[in-house]
């Protein structure tokens, strides 16, 4: 009972004086439930917990899937719909596309571990479709960087998350980061959280 009525995981859970779900729901945080669960299993080999929480992980991806348009691109949500970073004026659509691909692959791995071939194949197809769309519509050949939103914004978050998602190979990713650092786009990074992912990429 620690989710929204539709099953979405909240961005925050208060534990004192009793368990209370925060009313802030951020799509990237919800998707990371599955990625975190996968990482937890890989560190602990706790199959029972993996199995118990797998349905919740699957549900987060189902909810996120509703946010895509006919081109398989992430639509801009209403209000404070995703975190990504505190950068003012940050267009988050391409970064969120990357988070979705990244988490779909993690949830695919969960399904494979649990022997759910149907769910694993579904997540594999989702990741492939969203990756193809990112390459077709979000990669700007002129700058050699990913762009985001109607304004075709170039920001750190889009590059980082689409690289971490595996939308490009490691060599291409390195080239993108080199171009990014050289360009120094206006929309940089604010939080240690985002800087950590930049280093990881």
Briefly describe each language-model feature range.
Residues 1-201:
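Active-site core of glycosidic bond-cleaving carbohydrate-active enzymes
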